[in-house]
Amino acid sequence: MERLWAPWRMEYILEAKDPVREECIFCALPRAQTDRDNLIVWRGRYVFTMLNKFPYNPGHLMVAPYAHVADLDALHPEELTDLMLGVRRATGRLGRVMHPDGYNIGINLGRTAGAGIPGHIHFHVVPRWEGDHNFMP
């Protein structure tokens, strides 16, 4: 395959070129308390899980702390533990509901590493299936 064509991500790509971004979505959306509208599917003590509005694959989740931090070192041990437990919870739920063959799980630390929102750390949990021909940078 020469090119990945994911037209549902075009809105995200065009927004990413706009240097003026409003408030961090990982701060604003949980405060709004409208979880269904904001695609938040689970809340923990220190972290929450939401569907990615611009997914790489069906079921693409993001697990983020409520704290606005850019690096793992900035999280307290309890927050870091809750973050990893949130990732485990996400894979468990996706496994029961969507039955993927595997997952891509990762963090893009910094804009150079591909972070679209470099100021707020978050894990991507992307379910994968044999032959899905998808890609996660």
What are these regions (language model features)?
Residues M1-P137:
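HIT superfamily nucleotide-processing domains
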